[in-house]
C-alpha cells in the first residue's frame, strides 16, 4: 500500500513540474526575413520544416547582410554540420557531415553543379540541408545539399539599395539592387554586383561581375510568371596553396611570393548567359 501511495505521489509531482515548466517556457520568435518561416523551398514546392527528415539551417537575407557574407563559402564556415575545403582553388567544395561534394548545389530547387565560386548578390535565402536525401536528389546527396533562393521582383513596391565593402588586403565589392513597378500586376528587379579578390598571397587576384534582371507578372490570383536573365563573368588565379613539405621544413618562413604555376596561365574563367522561367 505504501509503494502504491509513493508511486501516486511521484506521478503527481512529475505532472505538476511538467505543467510548471510548460508555463515558464517562452514563446520562440523567428527573427529575420525568412521567405517561409516554417518551410523549405529546396524541394521545388514549399515543404514544412517538420516534414523534412533532415537537419535544416536557414540563412536569411538579413543575416547575409549583417555578417557581410560575400560568397557561399562564407556561409558554410559559420554553419554547423558542414565545412568548406579548398576546392582546388577554383570551385566550391563542401563537406556535408564528412562527405565531400562539388555538385550538391541547387538554386530555386534546380541543380546547379557548375564548377565555380557562387556569389550571393542576388540571393534572398540559403537553405543548408544536412543528411542523406538520395530519394529526391540522387545518390550524390548522401551527405546533404545547399539550396539558394533567388531574389524575386516584388509587385507593389519600389526601392533601391547600394552596398559596398573592402578589406585590408585591398579587395572591394559593390552591389546594387533596384525593384520597380511596371504596372499594377507586374514588377522588374535589377541586381548588379562587382568585386575584386585579394589576400595575403602576392599572386592571388581576380574579379567577378554579376548582372541579374528579373521580371514578374501576376497571370491570375493563383499564378505568377517569372522571367530571369543573368550574366556571369568570373576570372581568378587558381592558387592551390603551399605543399606541406615546405611548411614542415621551414615553419618560420613566409611564402607569400611563392606560387606553383604561372599567374598568367593558371586562371579560372566562368562566362555564362543564364535564362530561366
Positions of PLM-derived features:
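Soluble non-cytosolic domains of exported or imported proteins
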Residues: 58, 66-70, 169, 206, ...
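Acidic/polar loop-and-plug regions of large Gram-negative outer-membrane beta-barrel proteins
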Residues: 195-199, 212-218, 222-276
Amino acid at each position: 500500500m505504501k509503494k502504491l501511495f509513493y508511486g501516486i505521489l511521484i506521478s503527481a509531482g512529475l505532472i505538476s513540474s511538467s505543467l510548471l515548466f510548460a508555463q515558464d517556457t517562452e514563446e520562440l520568435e523567428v527573427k529575420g526575413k525568412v521567405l517561409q518561416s516554417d518551410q523549405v523551398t529546396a524541394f521545388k514546392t514549399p515543404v514544412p520544416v517538420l516534414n523534412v527528415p533532415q537537419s535544416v539551417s536557414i540563412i536569411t537575407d538579413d543575416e547575409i547582410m549583417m555578417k557581410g557574407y560575400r560568397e557561399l563559402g562564407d556561409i558554410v564556415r559559420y554553419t554547423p554540420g558542414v565545412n568548406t575545403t579548398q576546392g582546388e582553388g577554383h570551385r566550391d567544395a563542401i563537406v556535408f557531415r564528412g562527405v565531400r561534394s562539388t555538385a550538391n548545389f541547387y538554386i530555386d530547387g534546380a541543380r546547379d553543379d557548375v564548377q565555380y565560386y557562387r556569389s550571393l548578390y542576388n540571393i534572398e535565402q540559403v537553405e543548408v540541408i544536412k543528411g542523406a536525401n538520395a530519394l529526391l536528389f540522387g545518390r550524390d546527396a548522401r551527405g546533404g545539399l545547399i539550396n539558394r533562393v533567388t531574389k524575386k521582383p516584388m509587385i507593389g513596391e519600389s526601392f533601391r539599395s547600394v552596398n559596398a565593402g573592402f578589406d585590408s588586403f585591398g579587395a572591394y565589392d559593390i552591389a546594387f539592387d533596384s525593384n520597380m513597378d511596371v504596372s499594377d500586376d507586374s514588377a522588374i528587379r535589377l541586381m548588379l554586383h562587382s568585386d575584386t579578390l585579394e589576400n595575403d598571397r602576392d599572386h592571388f587576384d581576380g574579379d567577378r561581375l554579376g548582372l541579374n534582371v528579373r521580371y514578374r507578372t501576376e497571370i491570375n490570383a493563383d499564378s505568377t510568371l517569372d522571367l530571369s536573365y543573368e550574366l556571369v563573368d568570373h576570372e581568378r588565379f587558381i592558387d592551390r596553396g603551399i605543399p606541406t613539405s615546405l611548411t614542415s621544413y621551414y615553419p618560420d618562413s613566409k611564402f607569400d611570393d611563392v606560387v606553383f604555376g604561372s599567374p598568367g596561365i593558371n586562371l579560372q574563367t566562368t562566362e555564362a548567359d543564364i535564362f530561366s522561367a
